[in-house]
Amino acid sequence: MLLKCAQVLSESQKKCGIIVNEVGEIGIDNLQMKKMRFNVWEIFGGCICCTLAISLEETVHQLLNNYDLDTILLEPSGASDPSALYKPLEKSGYTTQKIKNIFILDPLRVDMFEAVLEPYLESSIPLANAVIINKIDVASAFELEESVRVIRKYSKDVPIFRINVNDVDSGIIKRILEG
């Protein structure tokens, strides 16, 4: 999804920086984005919402001061708490009004998320400017309905977008990013 957002921004003549937080040593997504000539800043060795918050702050500060960017795309690792990301972003000069928080929900695993990661859903979905239900091409009608139920449990009015990431309409991505 991050790659698709970068492509849409690039097609719209927007300059974007991409920050990816990888827990492992090698970022597979990062390699793909670099092959497509996107500049990617990688933050390794932990979660940017807690142990690497200073690294995030420094990276964003560097991007804002040294590059003429329209947008910074940020992909935290795994189940990072998005509320913990706001403070380092604000300290680096990014305003809360400029942050677009997009939550992506996998409908194939929504039951597991609700059973195991309920506190994460409870803190993440209310902060989201939009929620994307991904993999609609392989999810059952029941899984999609459950996904909407879970989203609405935590936010009654967040916009929900249903997509197949392999065949997503660029117009939908633009609406989400401009939202």
Regions found by a protein language model. Give the residues of each.
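Long, charged, low-complexity intrinsically disordered regions
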Residues: Y154, V158-G179
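Nucleotide-state-sensitive switch-loop elements of NTP-binding domains
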Residues: M1-F113
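Short, exposed beta-strand "edge-strand" segments with a Pro/Gly-rich flavor and a Y/T-containing core
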Residues: N66, D137-A139, D167
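Short, structured coil/loop segments at alpha-helix boundaries
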Residues: K14, E114-E118, S170
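Alpha-helix boundary recognition
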Residues: Q7-S10, P126, R152, L177
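Short, ordered loop/turn segments at secondary-structure junctions
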Residues: N21-V23, I136, V165
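Phosphate/Mg2+-binding loops and adjacent switch elements
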Residues: T71-R162
